[in-house]
Structure formats: C-alpha cells, structure tokens
UniProtKB/Swiss-Prot annotation:
SUPFAM superfamilies from the UniProt entry: FAH
Keywords from the UniProt entry: Aromatic hydrocarbons catabolism, Lyase, Plasmid
Name of the gene this protein is made from: xylI
Name of this protein: 4-oxalocrotonate decarboxylase
Species of the source: Pseudomonas putida (Arthrobacter siderocapsulatus)
Similarity-based family: Belongs to the hydratase/decarboxylase family.
Assigned EC number: 4.1.1.77
Annotated catalysed reactions: (3E)-2-oxohex-3-enedioate + H(+) = 2-oxopent-4-enoate + CO2
Molecular function GO terms recorded: 2-oxopent-4-enoate hydratase activity; 4-oxalocrotonate decarboxylase activity
Length: 264
C-alpha cells in the first residue's frame, strides 16, 4: 500500500481530526494541506484515531460501510466503498435523545445492520460466505457528521475522518436472515411526521450482504478480518437527511418495526 505521510504527520492529523469530532467544530479537509495523500494514508489515520479512543478507554463496538451506492461510487470515480469504526459512545437507544450540541451538521441515513456468528476473512470473501456467517439482522439509523466545513470533502479526507461516523440508533426487531429478504426490504423515513425518504435494501450494492463481503476484503488489505460477534452497519438505504434540534425522526422497516429518536 502506497503511503506518503510519515508517522509524525499521521499522529498530528489523527489528533487534529479527532479533536474536531470531540469538540464539535469543523475543519478544512486534510487533503488541502496534503494533496498527495493516498487511501493507505487515510486508513492509517483512521486506525490511529481508533487506537486513541481505545487508549482513552472507549470500546470499539462495530464497523460501518459507506459509499455503498453504485451510482455514488461512479460519481466519485472509485470502485469500492469505504469503511469506518463505531465507538461505544456512538450508540443511542431507540426512542432516545441525540444531543446536537456535540455534533456539527448531523444527517441521518436508514440502514440494515448485521451481527456475525463466525469470522469473515478476505481476500476472496463473497456473499455466500456472509450468508453463512450472519447471526441476525437489525434495523439501524446512522447519524453521520462530517468534521469538514459545509459537509464538503473528497474521498480520501472522509476515510481519514472515520467515514463521518458519529452516532447510531438500533431498534425495531431482530430477525434471522432466512426470515427476511434484505434486497426487497422496504424503508420509510419520516421527519416530524412527514415522509422524507423511501428506499429498499437493494440500494446497498444490490444486496446489503454484498457490503459485508466487501468490508472483509477491504480489511484484508491491512491484514485484518471481521471477528465473530461483530456488529456491522451495511450502508445507507436512503439518501442522508439533515436534522437539527427539535426534530423527531422515525424510520419504518417492512416487517421489522421502526427506529426513532429525538434531536435536541
């Protein structure tokens, strides 16, 4: 993997980006100052942010995929999605409150998450491997919050920023894989009682489990894998919708109940 940043630059950028998250202030995208940065550099920064959180006592409780729409990938000129990690304090209970004072410019996406019962190891991981390894699925709403000004960034910058990860809400009911067709699963997103987005699971790479296979293969590039018992958000079924203090959101999942939260 081609890298252009030295260790000191990685450490400084990881601290800079994480401070923006923890202090809820926006920053210029990092490629403004480091235009030669590569994806390998960006993931090295992301893993350093992860290490900083673990050193501080936070637990890493899951993984997430981003850029999981074929159209969006074509628009960005890339061939694979991106991934990030989920820290323990990102979790919000169903019906709970999201404190916007700790965020910059939050948006929500409807997603399907899975929990694995067996490890998944790339390269060469495919959807059949994922089907055999998934324990159950659960409806999830992701709150994304880019640390970059005006939510404007390039792909390398967003990878370094942990794929804009900040909060997630799980709810509805868990289901076994054989009891639900994730490809045709319908989703309705409501904000303040009005429908704002509609979608189906096929929006995620044709099938949400394809996203999990890609995650295993991306992790393999760093010598990592997906352990058994991993919570994975597979990617946005709907477009991202901006939220602000005073907003109430509910996302309804066909046959799986709903997930809701209040923003203050």
């Amino acid at each position: 993997m081609n890298r252009t940043l030295n260790r000191e630059q990685v450490l400084a950028l990881a601290e800079h980006i994480e401070n923006a998250e923890l202090q809820a202030h926006d920053i210029h995208k990092v490629t403004n100052d480091y235009p030669e940065m590569t994806f390998a550099d960006a993931y090295t920064i992301q893993w350093e942010i992860r290490r900083r959180k673990e050193e501080r006592g936070n637990k890493i409780v899951g993984l997430k995929m981003g850029l999981t729409s074929w159209a969006k990938m074509a628009q960005m000129g890339v061939e694979t999605p991106i991934y990030g990690f989920l820290a323990d304090y990102f979790s919000v209970p169903d019906g709970g409150v999201v404190d916007c004072s700790k965020l910059i410019h939050p948006k929500i996406e409807a997603e399907i998450a899975v929990v694995t019962k067996a490890p998944l190891v790339g390269p060469g991981c495919h959807i059949g491997d994922v089907i055999a390894a998934v324990d159950y699925v659960i409806p999830t709403v992701e709150v994304i919050d880019s640390r970059y000004e005006n939510f404007k960034f390039d792909l390398i910058s967003v990878v370094a920023d942990n794929a804009s990860s900040t909060r997630y809400i799980t709810g509805g009911r868990m289901a076994n894989l054989e009891d639900v067709d994730l490809r045709t699963l319908g989703v309705v997103m409501e904000k303040n009682g009005e429908v704002v987005e509609l979608g189906a699971g096929a929006a995620v790479l044709g099938h949400p489990l394809s996203s999990v296979a890609m995650l295993a293969n991306l992790l393999a590039e760093r010598g990592e894998h997906i352990p058994a018992g991993t919570f994975i958000m597979t990617g946005g079924i709907t477009a991202a919708v901006a939220v602000a203090p005073g907003d109430n959101i509910t996302v309804r999942y066909q046959g799986l109940g709903s997930v809701s939260a209040r923003f203050v």
